[in-house]
Amino acid sequence: MGVEHELVVVDEFDALSIELKRPNGSSSSSPSRAVSVEKYPAKTHARKVADKLGVDKGLIYLQGKPTTTYEDSDMEPPFRQRRYFYYMSGADFPNAHLTYDVATDQLLLWIPTRQPREELYLGRIPSREDCMSRLDVDDCRDVVQMTRFIAAHLKHHPGTTLFLLHSDQAPGLDDLPVQYAGRRLDIGRLRLAVDAARVIKTPFEIRQIRRANQVSSEAHRAVLRQIRHLRTEADVEAVFVAACRVRGARSQAYNPIAGAGANAATLHYVDNAAPLKGKQTLVLDAGCEWDCYASDITRTMPAAGRKFSPEAQTIYRIVEKMQNACIDLVRPGVSYLFIQATAQLVAIEEFLKIGLLVGDKAKIAASRVVSAFFPHGLGHHVGLETHDVRSERLLGYDKSSAALWRGKRLVMSVEQCDRVAELMVTARQQGADARDALAEGMVITIEPGIYFNRQYIEAFCSDVPERGSFINKSVLDRYYPVGGVRIEDDILVTADGYENLTTAPKGEEALRIINGDDVEADAVLV
């Protein structure tokens, strides 16, 4: 059945709606971005931060992202607001600042103004009235008055600490009282407090992340509908980004990964340029932002044709089983590291069934050979960042391990692999007070993957020759052409379990869409 469509303006902000015309003359519209009347809960977030700071007085200062240009250029990069500032303000435009007086609970947003000539070139920025109507702040004031305000506040409240995020983001206070020199400036505690506040999402934040997931899931669905007609990884990326854009999502949460065949075995592959023909799998790891809040979704599909090869189907089913087992464990108090161990244990059991691994299961677990195929952490927090604050804590890392982060996935250290191996052998759940325990209001990813990266597998096994003794090389050779399989959903931890925020099709549902059995296919533009 044919369906006509047209783009129409639905409000004064020029939001676009996809108008669907059906043969009977009826129509339906899906606004790409409706005008929200709900204020951003800046005050709620500020109070959470103050609570985590554990103080009853003090002045918090945060600086928004200033206008910048590329190095040796007069061209501006796409604007991306500083996330710590956005969390406490909701202001998504450059050159703004905020102050929060803990004692009086006063949250002020300091905003710039543009002269008519600047507006001619750059357009207008939100006015005081705009900000007051959309953001839950006590007042919006002209930024030119800010330094005078802060200096006066510190002068008249000599016992007050000024909390800063970074030393290079301090307000320029020429008349800062001498007695403050190095003694009442706190640089360090604010970041920890904001991190602690951000890790548990407010209802507003959950709605934003859910919306980002809805848009991204529809974009993944659009790719599934068209994948048999696409020729390159670039085509896949283009379809996904376009589908997000027409639904009102202006930015991607991270650079999309569209890797086919061997490229699917590169965790952070972003070239997205190779042909799809002749490849067994396509890993599409892509998610949009909605008002600065991220989604993070991965789906694996046949790169060409209507179905997986037998080998790719086998690996897909294993990863699917890994993910289902892990998601079923999500609830408050559960150790995330234990969930990671569960994923690896499922992989070992399934590898033994297909003959990829041979030997005693306990010895295989202790050898950590499964990390040759599943080398990364199971997931991370999602929020204002794709890899949101405190994600390293999910796998028991401390700040000294920050260098182990590589993009969206954590490189498992030897120590962490040993801890996971111990959990696999003992099947022992850590206590609810563990630093990696889940809590209500967290949004995390569950993203197991299996990869056949020849160079990595050979190097991993050569480091400890015993590992290679557990791998059946002839079986392994059959699976190298698969490349890789990863499945990733965003999971909200609820009071008694979880809610899967991701609705992107996977498994048999995805294959039905690829094969044209999607009953909704004629009612969507992209």
Swiss-Prot record:
Catalytic reactions of this protein: Release of any N-terminal amino acid, including proline, that is linked to proline, even from a dipeptide or tripeptide
Biological process according to GO: proteolysis
Uppermost EC category: hydrolase
Enzyme Commission identifier(s): 3.4.11.9
Cofactor(s) needed: Mn(2+)
Residues engaged in binding Mn(2+) 2: D285, D296, E488
Keywords: Aminopeptidase, Hydrolase, Manganese, Metal-binding, Metalloprotease, Protease
One Pfam family from the record: AMP_N
Bilayer-crossing regions: none
Co-factor remark: Binds 2 manganese ions per subunit.
Residues that coordinate or bind Mn(2+) 1: D296, E447, E488
GO molecular function, one term: metalloaminopeptidase activity
Annotated function: Catalyzes the removal of a penultimate prolyl residue from the N-termini of peptides.
Family per similarity comment: Belongs to the peptidase M24B family.
Name this polypeptide is given: Probable Xaa-Pro aminopeptidase MGG_05684
Species assigned in the record: Pyricularia oryzae (strain 70-15 / ATCC MYA-4617 / FGSC 8958)
Lineage: Eukaryota, Fungi, Dikarya, Ascomycota, Pezizomycotina
